[in-house]
């Protein structure tokens, strides 16, 4: 469940900005039918930053309900205050989720020791498997391989989503962790190379709109068929890149609407609708991928 193509699913909303259950069900059904390995609910792409804690928990529980055991659900539970992250994580202790994705604290930029103590404290307050999430371009701090190696020895910490796009990190981390520590890419454009170096899969934005292709690419890579996987990846490469032509999840939410997967591409401020130029750029990438 912690391998292959794991979608960082969008949180669909109606025109008033309320979570749209019907669109979420349609998305989940799409991922079940497409072979997606698991769903990350309310991560960065799921607009965690603009949902309050009650809404956050409600979306995760709604996702679990709609998934109905057909696909594993991972909850995004990160926060920049350790006590807050613990509280959010503990909401899901007996919920049925299979694990938590916990981002490094953002804005306050803790030291490596602070990061170690933060994640250790969270892991000690739950029995849920914890996946570390390193995305310094968003958080302002970088979880270094040496710290990952220390954290890998903590009970319940089972893997990392590495979203730096720095492929040297794969071997650096592999040298410091056990073979069963899960290495997941958080960068679609380099995910195949990440897997070829020994990674286990990707937590993907692209999978929101190209679920079957991403699942097949990861399956081929896991089986060692990298030439065949690369054919798929090259077709998707413009999409990997252009889904970030404007801040995530603006482009991917619009793409989901364009493909009829959600009813609207409504976002909450400070996220604003995609621009005309952004729309045309993403549409061209969808066509290149064979999705339009």
Swiss-Prot record:
<comment type="similarity">
    <text>Belongs to the DapA family.</text>
</comment>
<feature type="binding site">
    <location>
        <position position="203"/>
    </location>
    <ligand>
        <name>pyruvate</name>
    </ligand>
</feature>
<feature type="site" description="Part of a proton relay during catalysis">
    <location>
        <position position="107"/>
    </location>
</feature>
<dbReference type="Pfam" id="PF00701">
    <property type="entry name" value="DHDPS"/>
</dbReference>
<keyword id="KW-0456">Lyase</keyword>
<keyword id="KW-0028">Amino-acid biosynthesis</keyword>
<feature type="site" description="L-lysine inhibitor binding">
    <location>
        <position position="84"/>
    </location>
</feature>
<feature type="site" description="L-lysine inhibitor binding">
    <location>
        <position position="80"/>
    </location>
</feature>
<comment type="function">
    <text>Catalyzes the condensation of (S)-aspartate-beta-semialdehyde [(S)-ASA] and pyruvate to 4-hydroxy-tetrahydrodipicolinate (HTPA).</text>
</comment>
<keyword id="KW-0457">Lysine biosynthesis</keyword>
<keyword id="KW-0021">Allosteric enzyme</keyword>
<feature type="site" description="L-lysine inhibitor binding; via carbonyl oxygen">
    <location>
        <position position="49"/>
    </location>
</feature>
<keyword id="KW-0704">Schiff base</keyword>
<protein>
    <recommendedName>
        <fullName>4-hydroxy-tetrahydrodipicolinate synthase</fullName>
        <ecNumber>4.3.3.7</ecNumber>
    </recommendedName>
</protein>
<dbReference type="InterPro" id="IPR020625">
    <property type="entry name" value="Schiff_base-form_aldolases_AS"/>
</dbReference>
<dbReference type="GO" id="GO:0019877">
    <property type="term" value="P:diaminopimelate biosynthetic process"/>
</dbReference>
<dbReference type="GO" id="GO:0042802">
    <property type="term" value="F:identical protein binding"/>
</dbReference>
<feature type="active site" description="Proton donor/acceptor">
    <location>
        <position position="133"/>
    </location>
</feature>
<feature type="site" description="Part of a proton relay during catalysis">
    <location>
        <position position="44"/>
    </location>
</feature>
<dbReference type="InterPro" id="IPR020624">
    <property type="entry name" value="Schiff_base-form_aldolases_CS"/>
</dbReference>
<comment type="pathway">
    <text>Amino-acid biosynthesis; L-lysine biosynthesis via DAP pathway; (S)-tetrahydrodipicolinate from L-aspartate: step 3/4.</text>
</comment>
<dbReference type="GO" id="GO:0009089">
    <property type="term" value="P:lysine biosynthetic process via diaminopimelate"/>
</dbReference>
<feature type="binding site">
    <location>
        <position position="45"/>
    </location>
    <ligand>
        <name>pyruvate</name>
    </ligand>
</feature>
<keyword id="KW-0220">Diaminopimelate biosynthesis</keyword>
<keyword id="KW-0963">Cytoplasm</keyword>
<comment type="subunit">
    <text>Homotetramer; dimer of dimers.</text>
</comment>
<feature type="site" description="L-lysine inhibitor binding">
    <location>
        <position position="106"/>
    </location>
</feature>
<dbReference type="GO" id="GO:0005829">
    <property type="term" value="C:cytosol"/>
</dbReference>
<dbReference type="InterPro" id="IPR005263">
    <property type="entry name" value="DapA"/>
</dbReference>
<dbReference type="InterPro" id="IPR002220">
    <property type="entry name" value="DapA-like"/>
</dbReference>
<feature type="active site" description="Schiff-base intermediate with substrate">
    <location>
        <position position="161"/>
    </location>
</feature>
<dbReference type="InterPro" id="IPR013785">
    <property type="entry name" value="Aldolase_TIM"/>
</dbReference>
<dbReference type="GO" id="GO:0008840">
    <property type="term" value="F:4-hydroxy-tetrahydrodipicolinate synthase activity"/>
</dbReference>
